[in-house]
């Protein structure tokens, strides 16, 4: 029987990162940067106002007090986007908007809140110092500064920075394309009538969502019955359109209707095994299709499929993008109740983190089919293979499901 760590290591050793591509900023969203980005121009590119107010020479406000304000003539206005060259005469001011270029001769901005808001003459009730409310050119980044290092995931802030730096495209590894489907004669599409012995198919929706949350471009196919020919046809079709295939069901140990296993054993490129874990013991990994597309075959019980995704599919997605971040960050929390675990298997029990994530409460529904109980959980409690019980007050390793 394989260990959890050994099986994961086998998967990660076989995954080859996707080739970097030149992507527009829109298409790079969720991708992983494959080049260092340096500033070609100063950020911001020019001195500008950090507030709505009045551009002044700071020395002209030195005598201002609330009881005896300094009054200056307002000789015009500078708006954001104004490309004209404005010059500030001594003893005067210019009304200025946030982001507008600082006029020549000005060295400070008086926020409008510190004035009477005048349009032809303005009373200033307190002095300002040179540099107040001014955003200096290059104050955020100077030319040659590294703005973003290769290997980071491109999300809202990095993409905003790239745009602010004038970049329209970047070299990045794209979001992996993932195809998910489930197998089983018992499965019916949600929203359709079901007879006794049938259930609504849920795993493909859950796993596709989990893949998107993990940074993939994921889609699902309708479930297929326990027919190896149909399963193999779907796998061969999807392999040419995806970077990773994920199946659910059809891999149990000794089952007579294990269509996924029967289909893939014809190819001889996927290895099925038992992994010493609960839930999720039956697993399979290999490659399919002319492009050797990786495939992970997960158990059919919903909780088993979800835990398997967290432990094996999510790290595989990160490996496809060439990231070196932690595949499964863990923390430690105090148990609020005792628990039991089978010997020789690493257990992943559902629990609820509380008290600022310092305590963990095991849930009562721990069976591998209990999806409603999983929906109440926000963490997995990791119980090592050699531990069969833990007591209230013991410190447990936990995996947060909120990240």
Predicted regions located by residue number:
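Flexible glycine/proline-rich
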Residues: 2, 21-26, 34-35, 48, ...
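Short, glycine/charged-enriched hinge/interface segments at domain edges or termini
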Residues: 2, 54-225, 360, 364, ...
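Intrinsically disordered, low-complexity, positively charged segments
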Residues: 1-69, 154
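Solvent-exposed alpha-helices and their adjacent loops that cap or buttress functional pockets
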Residues: 47-49, 62-67, 85-89, 102-104, ...
């Amino acid at each position: 029987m394989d260990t959890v760590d050994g099986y994961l290591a086998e998967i990660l050793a076989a995954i080859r990162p996707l080739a970097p591509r030149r992507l527009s900023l829109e298409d790079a969203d969720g991708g992983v940067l494959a080049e260092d980005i340096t500033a070609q121009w100063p950020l911001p590119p020019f001195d500008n106002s950090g507030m709505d107010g009045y551009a002044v020479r700071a020395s002209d406000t030195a005598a201002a007090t609330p009881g005896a304000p300094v009054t200056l003539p307002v000789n015009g206005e500078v708006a954001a986007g104004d490309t004209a060259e404005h010059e500030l005469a001594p003893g005067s001011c210019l009304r200025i908007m946030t982001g507008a270029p600082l006029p020549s001769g000005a060295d400070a901005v008086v926020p409008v809140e510190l004035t009477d808001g005048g349009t032809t003459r303005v009373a200033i009730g307190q002095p300002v110092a040179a540099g107040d409310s001014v955003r200096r050119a290059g104050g955020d980044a100077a030319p040659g500064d590294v703005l973003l290092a290769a290997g980071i995931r491109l999300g809202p802030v990095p993409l905003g920075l790239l745009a602010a730096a004038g970049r329209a495209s970047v070299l990045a590894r794209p979001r992996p394309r993932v195809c998910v489907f489930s197998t089983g004669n018992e499965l019916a599409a949600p929203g359709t009538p079901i007879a006794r012995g049938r259930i609504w198919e849920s795993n493909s929706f859950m796993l596709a969502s989990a893949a998107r949350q993990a940074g993939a471009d994921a889609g699902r196919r309708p479930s297929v019955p326990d027919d190896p020919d149909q399963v193999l046809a779907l796998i061969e079709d999807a392999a040419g359109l995806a970077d990773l295939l994920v199946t659910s069901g059809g891999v149990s140990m000794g089952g007579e209707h294990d269509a996924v296993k029967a289909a893939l054993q014809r190819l001889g490129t996927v290895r099925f095994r038992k992994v010493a874990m609960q839930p999720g013991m039956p697993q399979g990994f290999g490659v399919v299709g002319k492009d050797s597309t990786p495939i992970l075959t997960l158990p059919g019980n919903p909780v088993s499929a979800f835990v398997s995704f967290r432990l094996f599919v999510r790290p595989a997605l990160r490996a496809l993008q060439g990231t070196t971040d932690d595949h499964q960050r863990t923390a430690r929390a105090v148990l609020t109740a005792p628990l039991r675990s089978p010997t020789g298997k690493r257990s992943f029990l559902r629990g609820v983190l509380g008290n600022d994530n310092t305590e963990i409460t095991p849930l009562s529904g721990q069976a591998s089919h209990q999806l409603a109980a999983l929906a109440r959980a926000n963490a997995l409690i990791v119980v090592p293979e050699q531990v069969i019980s833990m007591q209230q007050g013991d410190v447990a390793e936990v995996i947060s499901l909120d990240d």
